[in-house]
Amino acid sequence: MAVNMTMGRDTKWLTLEVCREFQRGTCSRSDAECKFAHPSRSCHVENGRVIACFDSLKGRCTRENCKYLHPPPHLKTQLEINGRNNLIQQKAAAAMLAQQMQFMLPGAQLQPITTFPMTHSLATSPSMAFSPYLNHMGPGMGLMPELLPSTPLLVPGSPTGLAAMSNGTSSPKHMRTDKLEVCREFQRGNCTRGESDCRYAHPLEAGMVDSSENSVIVCMDYIKGRCSRDKCKYFHPPAHLQARIKASQHQASQNTASAALSPPAGTMQLLPKRPVLEKSNGAVAGIFNPSMFHYQQALANMQLQQPAFIPTGEWCSGVVTLC
């Protein structure tokens, strides 16, 4: 079932902070070097922020005095990365909303949930082990966790994920953020873009290039502004590629942090059992379990439906003679 959604354009990913030194007229950096925006007089600045021109990112803005910012190459690269991340978030939100709409719209099909048999050792009597009136309910279902044996519970995950983990093939592959692909047109001498405009690396020395991957290793000291080597064997990227590397490192750190918080798929997570129903003052806590209540009520109804045994006979001097 498809859910149609009309989502307006979100301008948050197009918003840039304006350079305060530029507003005071004291910024010593140029537009292509400063990491903050240097808007023109025609741009609309609100609360120290300015919105970038979406048409300018596509290279199709024809307005003479555009009220939106036309960003330099290094800020344009940062905005393109923000736009891709924003699109991924919108698709994830749309998928989550479509999944939630299945529970509210009529005729929605619910996904089946795989369950496992409950504890059968609790059924000590044949009447509890089997009953034609309660044939769809396991004997251990509805009992409080505190009443079950004090053994840990195993929560099963995905069998495919467990098999993949056992084979050792589920380890994530970490992408390196200190490498840049070399421009093939630059290697042929046909690149029409400058070093500050091309999205690929333009190394000055051929010895920097890794021929197997056609990439160069970036000098991280140069990005941090502390490279003091005369002839550095690593690549010193321009400003727009530096912004791209910093954004990739930030995204990689976020992915690592989220992966560390979430358990791997398919693992058997051990859930500790709670102690017996005791409070700090020694009183027993009163707990109401709906499934247990319905189960006991069904047992009571099953007993009431059976015909009562009433002996029949004749009274003879206060003695009952059974027929």
Curated annotation (Swiss-Prot):
InterPro entries: Znf-CCCH_4 (IPR041367), Znf-CCCH_Muscleblind-like (IPR054429), Znf_CCCH (IPR000571)
GO cellular component term of the entry, any: nucleoplasm
Keyword flag Zinc: yes
Keyword Kinase: no
Tissue: Expressed in fast and slow myotomal muscle, heart, liver, skin, brain and testis.
Gene Ontology biological process: mRNA processing; regulation of RNA splicing; RNA splicing
Subcellular location: Nucleus; Cytoplasm
One Pfam entry name: zf-CCCH_4
The entry's keywords: Cytoplasm, Developmental protein, Metal-binding, mRNA processing, mRNA splicing, Nucleus, Repeat, Zinc, Zinc-finger
ZnF bounds (C3H1-type): 13-41, 47-73, 177-205, 213-239
SMART domains: ZnF_C3H1 (SM00356)
MF terms in GO: RNA binding; zinc ion binding
Family, similarity comment: Belongs to the muscleblind family.
Function: Involved in pre-mRNA alternative splicing regulation. Could inhibit terminal muscle differentiation, acting at approximately the time of myogenin induction.
UniProt protein name: Muscleblind-like protein 3
Species this chain originates from: Takifugu rubripes (Japanese pufferfish)
